[in-house]
Amino acid sequence: AGKTILLHAEQGFGDTIQFCRYVPRVAEQAGHVILEVQQPLRGLMSTLSGAAQIVSRGEPLPAFDLHCPLLSLPLAFGTRLETIPSQTPYLSAPSEKTSAWRDRLGNRERPRVGLVWAGDPRKSLPGANRIDRQRSLQFDQLAPVLRVRDCEFYSLQKGDDALEQLHRSALDHRVIDWSADFHDFSDTAALIENLDLVIAVDTAVAHLAGALGKPLWLINRHNTCWRWLLDRDDSPWYPTARLFRQDATREWDSVVARVQAALRDYARDWKIGSAPAASC
């Protein structure tokens, strides 16, 4: 107590979103927490409890007594599956941005579903690129999902290659793409706050939806990342997540078919008022 501790992000955006949940616990013990994050996350992190100061990576750092990488905090707290701090939401969008999206969207007539079908290819990093090719879909592979007529679909996708897939597709009319207005993660979060459901591959936006407490359907690769565990369709990290796993590497058809069937049920339940709706 009485010390100033620097908590600094490492690895990707999704890792920062997942493990910033420990910041309030650190603040209870250390007193003053400085949180250093990637610049596109700074606005979003302003909604996180426990951080007295937030700085962008590369900026001069204030004085501190101790430091710890975010991804070392589960070890520092002796985390086990049953002790994961799983309460959500622990992040939110700035209220003025959420209100602006609400006004833009207008009246809700059908469930609003956000989509992310690809990650960052990171072509200069062979290992990361290989994993991205395993976790990502081509946009047209989502065609069965887009045929669920009683839903509105919104792109939460970033990246020129993935968006080109959308805009050259015969199904592009089924998806509203306002991604040019996503300047940082707080903008994406504000749109998600106005949606009912997010369907995403294993990307930072999946973590964002989970951290916001939004229903998340994760389309997950067969050789899964460690954090999603094995042989379960839920997540101890995100209570609102439902996992749809591949049966074999790069075999997406059966996964997408299961998502399509689940979405048909969801849209039917939403229509009669029994599906969870967005809070906004």
Which stretches of residues belong to each language-model region?
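Catalytic machinery of carbohydrate-active enzymes
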Residues: 1-280
